Regions:
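N-terminal intrinsically disordered/low-complexity leader segments
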Residues: 1-7, 74-76, 201-203
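Short hydrophobic clusters on alpha-helical segments that form packing/core surfaces
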Residues: 12, 16-20, 94
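Helix-turn-helix
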Residues: 19-55, 59
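Short helix-capping/turn signature of helix-turn-helix
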Residues: 50, 109-115
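Amphipathic alpha-helical linker/stalk segments
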Residues: 58-90, 134
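Helical hydrophobic small-molecule/effector-binding pocket
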Residues: 62, 66, 85-110, 160-164
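C-terminal peripheral helix-coil segments that are non-catalytic and often amphipathic
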Residues: 92, 96, 136-139, 162, ...
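Amphipathic alpha-helical packing segments from all-alpha helical-bundle domains
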Residues: 96-100, 107, 117-144, 153-157, ...
């Protein structure tokens, strides 16, 4: 059973990130966060759970990293054996991770200085969970004589960055590249990625 203290802490985290994403980290006060949680703006209740507004943002960042790690572990447990299905599942998980953490990502892109001392931790998690893992898989495909790519690390970086581009553009400006819907974009990406991994040109 969740304790009242844990419940309040989670409510503060959720309310704060929503406010940071909507009106900006620097424009959000502790009183704003408390009021959004239904607490008295002048009560100082936030300080019972976090020493500062910055500490709250740091905790939200750690929670994001933990969620990415959990999704990585889930992918490892359920990864299909065939390339096409594995790529599809990986793509869906990357998009889900961006969607689930869209509010924190808005803060990161619009006010990077707010996350300045946390960027390395956050980016290391992103790299480990997407770029590096894709590079290892593509290197293995090349070593097995299946993929024909010359530079697995650079190629995998381009693949992951291209995949993440659509949801990030949607997140920031509510538009999509080329005005494509998400399904068409994903299916085109999957055909390209499968061609890279299998050495068979996409149709």
């Amino acid at each position: 059973m969740t304790s009242p203290a844990s419940s309040t802490r989670d409510r503060l985290l959720d309310a704060a990130i929503a406010l940071f994403a909507r009106q900006g980290y620097s424009s959000t006060s502790v009183a704003d966060i408390q009021q959004a949680c239904g607490l008295s703006p002048g009560s100082g209740a936030l300080y019972k759970h976090f020493p500062s507004k910055k500490a709250l943002l740091q905790e939200a960042t750690r929670r994001h990293v933990e969620q990415m790690d959990a999704m990585r572990d889930e992918y490892d447990r359920t990864r299909p054996s065939d390339t096409t299905s594995a790529l599809r599942q990986g793509a869906e998980q990357i998009w889900a991770s961006i969607d689930n953490n869209s509010q924190l990502l808005r803060v990161m892109f619009r006010e990077p200085e707010a996350l300045d001392d946390m960027i390395d931790e956050l980016w290391s998690a992103v790299a480990a969970n997407a770029y590096q893992r894709t590079a290892r898989a593509l290197s293995a495909a090349k070593d097995a004589g299946v993929s024909r790519v010359e530079d697995p690390e650079a190629t995998s970086t381009v693949l992951v960055a291209a995949l993440a581009y659509l949801p990030i553009v949607q997140l920031l400006i509510r538009r999509t590249p080329g005005k494509l819907d998400a399904d068409r974009f994903r299916e085109a990406w999957l055909r390209l990625a499968e061609g890279v991994f299998t050495g068979v040109p996409p149709t």
